[in-house]
């Protein structure tokens, strides 16, 4: 009969596991190196893109000293503007202003008013008159004479209608007085 022998040896080469561990370690190291390079490249490009958009144009190298008051018409972020003194914001707040595109600067006429091109969320403005300045607005019967006398107080500035629209910065009329709401819905 034929001699039937089985080989008890491993089907793998002698240093297979050592080579496998070495190749795995080298591939992980190469992957980490490539990943780190790509991460650094993306961080560099994102910081460069962010730095190319000007946040503030208050740098002394870009404008002469004589145009200090003209700086209020520029776009960007400004801290402690003159209009914030009338607002309810804290001292450390920022005034956010729309950023105009550099291509559109010369194509459209610019507004000369800093207040017209800036968002003021808590600016305290007097209410608008309902009709023209020569006519009184019609008030409900619940309005008291003290409310009528405060509607045209001498301390309030005179706001006029312009040719096309109202002057910039005026707010909508306030809600009705709290006393009239409380009288309309008494507690039971």
Curated annotation (Swiss-Prot):
Mode of membrane association: Single-pass membrane protein
Transmembrane regions listed in the UniProt entry: 24-44
Function: May regulate certain MYC target genes, MYC seems to be a direct upstream transcriptional activator. Does not seem to significantly affect growth cell capacity. Overexpression seems to mediate many of the known phenotypic features associated with MYC, including promotion of apoptosis, alteration of morphology, enhancement of anchorage-independent growth, tumorigenic conversion, promotion of genomic instability and inhibition of hematopoietic differentiation.
InterPro entries reported in the protein's UniProt record: Myc_target_1
Membership in a protein family: Belongs to the MYCT1 family.
Pfam families attached to this UniProt entry: Myc_target_1 (PF15179)
Protein's UniProt keywords contain Membrane: yes
Motif placement: Bipartite nuclear localization signal: 47-65
UniProt note on tissues of expression: Highly expressed in lung, heart, and skeletal muscle. Expressed in brain, eye, liver, kidney, smooth muscle, pancreas, thyroid, thymus, submaxillary gland, spleen, testis, ovary, prostate, epididymis, and uterus. Deregulated expression promotes apoptosis in response to growth factor deprivation. Overexpression in synergy with CCNB1 may promote genomic instability.
Keyword line: Membrane, Nucleus, Phosphoprotein, Transmembrane, Transmembrane helix
Gene Ontology biological-process annotations: hematopoietic stem cell homeostasis
Superkingdom of origin: Eukaryota
GO cellular component terms attached to this protein's record: nuclear body; nuclear membrane
Residue numbers carrying Phosphoserine: 87, 90, 93, 101
Compartment(s): Nucleus membrane
Name listed for the protein in its UniProt record: Myc target protein 1
